[in-house]
Amino acid sequence: MYFSILLRPAIDKRYWFGLSFVAALAMRAELAACLGNVPLQVKWPNDILADGGKICGILLEARNGAVVIGTGANITPVVPLTLAKHPATSLQSLGGEQVTPEDLADRYAAGLLSRISTYETQGFAPVRLEWLSHCAHIDSMMRVSLPDMQVEGHFDGLGADGALHLRRADGSRQEVTTGDVELMG
């Protein structure tokens, strides 16, 4: 299922970072409803993992006072990609509820808009707590590829601004606000 929505959030642009986490939690809730007891985790900032595989990815793009949230969720089994960094999985592969792309998109849109409304009134703190409760890889060693360098460390939490906190080998802390995360070992 591919889904994009254009929004003009009723919050200052400096808080738009939280929409990425809100979108991940909204889709995680809908996938959880389809999968029952299959554990679902979120990977910073907005991927959703199930049974060791990526079931959903979300991207945001902001421009001209609006933000587009693009979401891709795997409903049917996917062809394995030998070059993919993360194995993929799907609702059907995991024995999930039979759902059409349109139904999943409708449910996700309703949940997303409701959560965005809550975020606009309550801020990032409750989003952060919920996201951390479903977070994959707490204290795992990871490498983050940034535009001009790579940093490595143990995932040490999520900042109040959505930044990924890495605890480096020398004991220092690195805050990452953008980058591609790769698990090590």
Language model segments and positions:
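Long, positively charged amphipathic alpha-helical accessory segments at protein N-termini or as interdomain linkers
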Residues: I11-K13, F17-P39, A50-G185
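Structural signature of FAD isoalloxazine-binding scaffolds in flavoprotein oxidoreductases
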Residues: M1-L7
